[in-house]
């Protein structure tokens, strides 16, 4: 695919994905690559611009990430951020100093708005600093274009070579001019057009899938979640009836969810859809099991068995569709972060399944996946469907999973979601759900003492689920939810609201 490309070179900073998202907000395609990417690979990718991220290291550290000096002679504009700024200076024979005092938080910065980087900006504004080391002497050919009280070189440039460095973090909201500055780099320095869009992305993917698949058969494990749904629709638009979707209904879905998935994909999109009703099978395997990790493992393994059985019935299948998205690739593919997790999509399908993969969304962030879904005509409600764990309600019913507990959780959750929607909050809260702690408490209903279940409500705000804060839902909404659940759901006499952020808590209770 011919598209303008910006490379975000990863030095282990916490904001790497945010930098990439900021670039893409300007309709410019970018990829995150490790700092170990060779000069040859960079030349082959032919980027129009390069951004160095921040990172936790000092340029003087024994194992500090480095890049080859030749990178700065390729004629490609480079923007270094924080560690990336210091690394540029260090690599080009400037000087980096380690002071006793660090600079952290909101800081006033003086900007030289004659620089292309700060064009049309105020001379003084607010930025976000998070550093110890700083540049005490810029390399030959560079000049200082920003300062703070504590940092003599808050930004530098070699305009002739289109090399720029900033000590602050333009990608975060606290740098008030940050988005504008990145825009200046992309369009004033790199001279990009900004013509990458979700509609062009979908068209290109459909064309590529047609060419890749030919007349072969394809299967997709459809969960009804946003990622697998959008992936399935893209592939279906490319190859039509050559695609068969397998929807394993394990009986652990939310209220009416299985029927909704079947209706949308079978009726609206006219897909070949096999719905496997495996509720009894999954509940049988979960009987007597209360440990959350065992529950997850049992559900994952059983899902694989059911999927394999159905795939074999279809005969000669060449390709498997997965809803892998870009954060999955980044999290499993870079080697600079402190913690790396392996990526297992669709319940951890076995590696010995002899299918070639089709991953149409592997270049997109979640918000971009939603945008493609809207472009493809997937119902708005499904595109904005709440994140839902693979094991489903099994990990929202704490302790042993039974049909009775699932029914209670399902009804309470449906009421909570309904009232959030009525209040116009469904797209303002990242995730919200009801769960059933393994707790019963004393209550009074009428003139009788009761001893019934407690329902916990959980709602969080977040941008990426890595961290989250509890949602400040208006009291009147919580009051209505509480009254409705207690009155409409049997065996419930108490409602609690979880006011814990992540960390220390996780979003899910199990």
Swiss-Prot record:
EC number: 6.3.5.2
Glutamine amidotransferase type-1 domain segment(s): 5-195
Residue numbers binding ATP: 223-229
Domain GMPS ATP-PPase: 196-385
Quaternary structure (record): Homodimer.
Pathway field: Purine metabolism; GMP biosynthesis; GMP from XMP (L-Gln route): step 1/1
Pfam families: GATase, GMP_synt_C, NAD_synthase
Protein's UniProt name: GMP synthase [glutamine-hydrolyzing]
Name of the gene: guaA
GO CC annotation: cytosol
Keyword line: ATP-binding, Glutamine amidotransferase, GMP biosynthesis, Ligase, Nucleotide-binding, Purine biosynthesis
GO molecular-function term, one example from the UniProt record: ATP binding
Reaction(s) catalysed by this chain's protein: XMP + L-glutamine + ATP + H2O = GMP + L-glutamate + AMP + diphosphate + 2 H(+)
Highest taxon of source: Bacteria
Nucleotide-binding keyword on record: yes
Enzyme class, first EC level, given as a word: ligase
Cross-referenced HAMAP family: GMP_synthase
The keyword Signal appears for this protein: no
Protein's job: Catalyzes the synthesis of GMP from XMP.
